[in-house]
Amino acid sequence: AMTRNEVVVEFTGDDAVAIAAALKAHGADIINVSAGQTTNDAEPAYGRMFQVPFAEQIRLEADVPTIAAGNITSADQINTIIAAGRADLCALARPHLADPHFTLRAAAHYGFTPQVWPNPYLSAKDQAERMAEQGFEYHSVGRPHVAPVASAD
């Protein structure tokens, strides 16, 4: 507990579960789980899918669906998280910034043909499906490589 003008030094998974349970009790259908760097001295552990354990704990202990976020960069990671029951949905930011067609390409790669593509993208849909049939692997990263700009010297 804290009072006005105090800083929370430690916020545990158990605290998050208690808050999620209270939100569920007041009608929340799903909890978006994201741990942010909210203070200058925060030093969170950062790595691949680093916030998924938080979503999983809340999902299991508060018995409420969760949305996982945090350095989830591929369709394979998403499928693993969902199939393992670690979260109910995944939120992506950088992968969609790097590739606005991330979801459409992943659908083609996995052979999910009912995915609706906007009319202007239909030729890309055909190409993506043909490439998937020919065995091309689909990979997406959240931070695409950008070649350095040559010096003007």
Language-model regions, residue ranges each:
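Flavin-dependent oxidoreductase catalytic cores
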Residues: 1-153
